[in-house]
């Protein structure tokens, strides 16, 4: 057919059919191509049957027409085919690891080798390389930072070494592994091991029971450090002398000022229209409950200042004799019993104000003075204290609750109009009322009124002042 003149010879269809025939000679030395490799297909990745060589033993190179660029390429010569087959694992002889400046934050896709891939049949060690799905480079198995972070919680057994001196002391980490896990105290060969754990605070490995929190003494039997100079105890601490009895330095002047303040307080309460409509028994219930708090607000408004001095406490024998004489009328001689020093009654039972109780009064006065409370604000605060629905024995609870709520609303509107600033004036005023909970009414009576009224009860005084015209 080739030696004959065909009518279709020279046509495009004839040339395409003839170009598919493989009529190539023995391969010659490949020439240098200036153009880049084609991103072609892998249409010639497998040679045809019987096409690997000629009958004469001459080696041939099978060329295929690329369906992308139209040129002839040897089999498996396209970049696309190389990319598709690059994910296969390649076995190579392990070499010395090179210094890596920045390991890839890749995945652990090659963390575990496949079955039967741990070594070659000849016993030669192999290094498994995997194409990282993050950076596209080949890494040995377990060589990514992400895999190291995920497996950093595993316990590593290393030989114990002498601990190095840390300049900043032990880290304040947690001793999650204070007890050694079973079966991990030593290796099978009898070598001692040290369990290291990744600290959840600083990210470093510390030996077990090496944290500062764990090393703190947990019992009184542990050795204590050298005693240092401790700061002075606060005023509410009993060891600082806060329970020592005190008295007014100028009782005559202070007691007269306190009595005048009590009269003004009762006059303010008695002539309130909303208070006058209440029955006398309900008025007495309210006044007996809050007279001390109302007096403290009045003393803060009058800016009463006082000083106290420490008094000598009577001996235990004198207290016992005085108590027995009051009970028996002082007619019978009393034996002297023996009491232990730790059985002494507290300061409230002795009816002698202590230093801590007086300090609570001074703290409230200082708080009110620091706020610069006006006359109207003092009046609203007194109304809030007076109309308390939680008083035991109160019958008209809803009426008192409405009065307290109305007083708070008026105070809130007043502070909003007079104080326009970043701080909430209403909250600051109510915080001052919170300090009244730490003041005892019996302490106020003993400190300011006992030198004047003697043994008269304060409840009787409240009843007399409500019934008489002030």
From Swiss-Prot:
CDD domains: NR_LBD_Dax1 (cd07350). Residues 215-469 form the NR LBD domain. One of its GO terms (molecular function) is protein domain specific binding. Keywords: Cytoplasm, Nucleus, Receptor, Repeat, Repressor, Transcription, Transcription regulation. Sequence repeats lie at residues 1-67, 68-133, 134-200, 201-253. Its main location: nucleus. GO terms for cellular component: cytoplasm; membrane; nucleoplasm; nucleus; ribosome. It is found in: Nucleus; Cytoplasm. A motif (LXXLL motif 3) lies at residues 146-150. Gene3D superfamilies: Retinoid X Receptor (1.10.565.10). Homodimerization involved an interaction between amino and carboxy termini involving LXXLL motifs and steroid binding domain (AF-2 motif). Heterodimerizes with NR5A1 and NROB2 through its N-terminal LXXLL motifs. This is Nuclear receptor subfamily 0 group B member 1. The lineage of its organism: Eukaryota, Metazoa, Chordata, Craniata, Vertebrata.
């Amino acid at each position: 057919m080739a030696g004959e003149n065909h009518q279709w010879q020279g046509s495009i269809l004839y040339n395409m059919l003839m170009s598919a025939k493989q009529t190539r000679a023995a391969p010659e030395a490949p020439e240098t191509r200036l153009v880049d490799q084609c991103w072609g297909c892998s249409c010639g990745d497998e040679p045809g049957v019987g096409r690997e060589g000629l009958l004469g033993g001459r080696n041939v190179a099978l060329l295929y027409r690329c369906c992308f660029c139209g040129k002839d390429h040897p089999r498996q010569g396209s970049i696309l085919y190389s990319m598709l087959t690059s994910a296969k694992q390649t076995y190579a002889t392990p070499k010395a690891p090179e210094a890596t400046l920045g390991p890839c934050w890749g995945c652990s896709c090659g963390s575990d080798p496949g079955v039967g891939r741990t070594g070659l049949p000849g016993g030669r060690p192999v290094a498994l390389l995997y194409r990282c799905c993050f950076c596209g480079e080949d890494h040995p198995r377990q060589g990514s930072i992400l895999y190291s972070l995920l497996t950093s919680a595993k316990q590593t057994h290393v030989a114990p070494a002498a601990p190095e001196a840390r300049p900043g002391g032990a880290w304040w980490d947690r001793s999650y592994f204070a007890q050694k896990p079973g079966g991990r105290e030593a290796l099978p060969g009898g070598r001692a091991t040290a369990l290291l754990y990744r600290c959840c605070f600083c990210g470093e490995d510390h030996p077990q029971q090496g944290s500062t929190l764990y090393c703190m003494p947990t019992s009184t039997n542990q050795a204590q450090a050298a005693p240092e100079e401790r700061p002075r105890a606060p005023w509410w601490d009993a060891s600082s002398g806060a329970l020592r009895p005190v008295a007014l330095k100028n009782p005559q002047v202070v007691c007269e000022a306190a009595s005048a303040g009590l009269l003004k307080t009762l006059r303010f309460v008695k002539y309130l229209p909303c208070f006058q409509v209440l029955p006398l028994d309900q008025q007495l219930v309210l006044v007996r409950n809050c007279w001390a708090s109302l007096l403290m607000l009045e003393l803060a408004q009058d800016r009463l200042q006082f000083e106290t001095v420490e008094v000598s406490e009577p001996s235990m024998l004198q207290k016992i004799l005085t108590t027995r004489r009051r009970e028996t009328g002082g007619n019978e001689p009393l034996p002297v019993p023996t009491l232990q020093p730790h059985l002494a009654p507290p300061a409230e039972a002795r009816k002698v104000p202590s230093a801590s109780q007086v300090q609570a009064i001074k703290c409230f006065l200082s708080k009110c003075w620091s706020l610069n409370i006006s006359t109207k604000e003092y009046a609203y605060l007194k109304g809030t204290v007076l109309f308390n629905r939680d008083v035991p024995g109160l019958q008209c609870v809803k009426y008192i609750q409405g009065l307290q709520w109305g007083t708070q609303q008026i105070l809130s509107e007043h502070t909003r109009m007079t104080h326009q600033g970043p701080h909430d004036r209403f909250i600051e005023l109510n915080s001052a009322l919170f300090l009244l909970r730490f003041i005892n009414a019996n302490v106020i009576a003993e400190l300011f009124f006992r030198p004047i009224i003697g043994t008269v009860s304060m409840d009787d005084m409240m009843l007399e002042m409500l019934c008489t015209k002030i």
